[in-house]
Amino acid sequence: MLLHFTKMHGLGNDFVVIDLITQRARLDTERIRQLADRHVGIGFDQLLLVEPPRDPEMDFRYRIFNADGNEVENCGNGARCFARFVRDNRLTHKREIRVETQAGPLTLRVEDDERIRVDMGVPRFAPEVVPFDAPADAPAHCLEVDGETWDIGAVSMGNPHAVLRVDDVAQAPVARLGPLIERHPRFPRGVNVGFLQVVSRHEARLRVFERGSGETLACGTGACAAVAHGIRRGWLESPVDVHLPGGTLTLAWPAPDASLMMTGPATSVFEGRIALP
């Protein structure tokens, strides 16, 4: 069979989006890994599936798979691409779209300037929610990594994040520390690792080593987690422009019990078909 797909990106964080409403396919872990291979497949950071909702109050079900084939809870850049895809493919004409994810419901809104605003929900810091092995919630935790002690924030944006503050993100040891923290035993389900440089109270720079994908050009939930941690520590103040290698996201978190709002672009690159056995 031939499977139709769309290649998209949000600030360089790239996705393959597949409509499983108007077509059918069985995509197991090995098949997803093959599709993710940039040499013999299509290549992507994450695969996004558009499915009918199980909850009648929702418009769609939004599923996310990393390049290693594992399903994950949430992806902010992917959410923006999801909204662009369902509008461009006339699966909905709504500007405000409700989707169900493993992490719970998300609200996506297509703004007048065609940027996408995503209600990312309330950041959560309780260790059992992240999950992270710690006796209690705290603004910062000490983490032993490769003989060094790092001051980190542990944040859930529906998926787990560790945030480290660095003086210069360009010189941050992302390639060395990223995989060590991603698989650290204190994060039993693995973790996305953000390296945060505070530029001013309303501006930051960020690099993210994503769980199951490695360093990417942008990570929406990573930007949310970094801003939430930065505001909690008193380093940042809402709203914050976060500069990632692929571009800039605008984040607003006005109060601890408020949803964190993320606004940024979503771009279609090309459409194609691939043969599946």
Swiss-Prot record:
Task: Tell me which domain of life the UniProt entry assigns to the organism this sequence originates from.
Answer: Bacteria
Return the annotated site residues (Important for dimerization): F270
Name the site position(s) for Could be important to modulate the pK values of the two catalytic cysteine residues: H161, E210
Where it sits in the cell: the answer is: Cytoplasm
SS bonds (residue pairs): none
Keyword Isomerase, does the record have it? yes
Has keyword Isomerase?
yes
A Gene Ontology cellular-component term: cytosol
Active-site residues annotated for this sequence? C75 (proton donor), C219 (proton acceptor)
The UniProt entry, under Pfam families, shows: DAP_epimerase
Which molecular function terms from Gene Ontology are attached?
diaminopimelate epimerase activity
Which HAMAP family does the entry link to? DAP_epimerase
NCBIfam families named in the record: DapF
Q: How does it assemble?
A: Homodimer.
The UniProt entry, under PANTHER family, shows: DIAMINOPIMELATE EPIMERASE (PTHR31689:SF0), DIAMINOPIMELATE EPIMERASE, CHLOROPLASTIC (PTHR31689)
Q: What does this protein do?
A: Catalyzes the stereoinversion of LL-2,6-diaminopimelate (L,L-DAP) to meso-diaminopimelate (meso-DAP), a precursor of L-lysine and an essential component of the bacterial peptidoglycan.
Name of the protein in its database record? Diaminopimelate epimerase
Q: Which organism is it from?
A: Chromohalobacter salexigens (strain ATCC BAA-138 / DSM 3043 / CIP 106854 / NCIMB 13768 / 1H11)
